[in-house]
A protein has these predicted regions:
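Local beta-strand N-terminus motif with an aromatic residue
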Residues: 29, 52-53, 96, 134, ...
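Mid-domain Rossmann-like dinucleotide-binding core that forms the NAD(H)/NADP(H) cofactor-binding site
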Residues: 1-37
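C-terminal capping/lid region of NAD(P)-dependent oxidoreductase domains
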Residues: 126, 133-140, 148-168
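N-terminal Rossmann-like NAD(P) cofactor-binding module of classical short-chain dehydrogenase/reductase
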Residues: 56-57, 79
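Glycine-rich phosphate-binding loop and adjacent beta-alpha segment
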Residues: 7, 15, 24, 63-133, ...
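Short amphipathic alpha-helix with an adjacent loop that forms part of the alpha/beta core around
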Residues: 39-50
Length: 168
């Protein structure tokens, strides 16, 4: 959200609760959709007057990959960077070529280890952090002994921001 806001991008987002959407609006979200109350494919089409969006950052997996493709405008792309649902995606590729869309996978651990590839990105992020434009969102800090509690919070989708385990 914060990077999109810095870049002046119109940002649409989904969440399971209005409370989380409200908090994310503070980070730059302009159009929030509670996917437990409304189908986000329909909502995106309504909000964009049938056009769809240029890109979707998708981290749920399962059915959400195909649904994300349906949210795209012509020649849009879905960037898959996770599978929080644990479900394997199934995608009818006709959805892609019907609108010239593409799906890209991104594994941040791999990219982070590739210093030459990521050098300019780390430099830019560091500049934004130093300028106070980016603010890491820490949801809660747990002592290591409470790792199970922290993990349960993640599994239940009740977290907001990063959960930190304090080792010492």
């Amino acid at each position: 959200m914060q990077i999109g806001k810095i870049l002046g991008i119109e940002i649409y987002g989904t969440s399971s609760s209005d409370e989380k959407l409200s908090r994310v609006r503070e980070l730059g979200l302009q159009h929030g959709i509670n996917y437990k109350q409304k189908d986000y494919v329909d909502a995106i089409k309504d909000l964009t007057h049938g056009e769809g969006v240029d890109a979707v950052f998708e981290m749920l997996g399962g059915e959400h990959v195909a649904k994300s493709v349906k949210c795209l405008r012509d020649f849009g792309r879905v960037i898959v960077y996770g599978a929080a649902t644990g479900e394997i995606p199934s995608l009818d590729t006709r959805l892609l070529y019907a609108k010239g869309a593409s799906v890209h996978g991104v594994w941040l651990s791999y990219l982070s280890a590739n210093r030459p590839l990521m050098q300019s990105a780390w430099k830019q992020l560091s500049e934004w952090l130093a300028a106070g434009k980016l603010h890491p969102v820490i949801g809660k800090v747990y002592p290591l002994e409470e790792a199970r509690t922290a993990y349960t919070l993640l599994q239940e989708g009740k977290n907001y921001g990063k959960i930190v385990l304090k080792i010492a």
